[in-house]
Amino acid sequence: MPGRVLAGTSGFSYAAWSPLFYPPGLRSGALLPHYASRLPACELNNTFYARPKEDRIRGWTAAVPEDFRFIVKAQRGASVRALYGDDPAGSIAWLTEFLPTFGQRLGAVLFRVGNEIPRNDERLQELLTAWPHPIPLVLEAQHPSWTADETFAALRAAGAVLCTTDLDDQEETPDIRRTGPFLYLRLRRSTYTDAELDAWARRLVPFLDDGLDAFVLFRHDEDGTSALRAEGFADRVDRVRVTG
């Protein structure tokens, strides 16, 4: 059976997405249920800045179907400490202790390493060793030095997922590399043509046909166009699978 396309956006709480994506007049508390009725996944932006309280998490999970998946962005300060601090295990415990509240609706934790942080194989291995393995981990490492066989091998051995990120300022299209049990693609350009989205869908098809699920997350924008792109992406994959 082909894998599932779990498309979504970075965040959902954007009143400016009305009327293109959200109906006019929709109250703030109804944004997430409406989003989840049309899209199967969402990156939570606010967890990158602060750890959410349990009652807020319970509100999120109650608002979405059982097969919906949240991707939690690891809090940025603790992420750096987990990779380069004196107590990575302690930082990871702080980062992850609230995650069980998400239950089965937790899709993954997105661990972002900024462009100012070069590759360090020893510290990456310490992070992967200390990470709670039942929690799916996705690594987005932006410094070019992380694009190395050593990184791929370490992630593969730990069952962690390498994030593929497509950005406006990239001259070359990034490779999709399978290191874990699913794929994670961030489409972060400010705009995409249909031909460009078809090309990404086409590149995912062989992995999906091997049974891998693929998260595909678009950046948020001003009017909700990105949410519409995400909503149509699974159908786009089905179409290019047939037409080539």
Region spans (language model):
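Residues lining hydrophobic/aromatic ligand-binding pockets adjacent to catalytic sites
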Residues: M1-G244
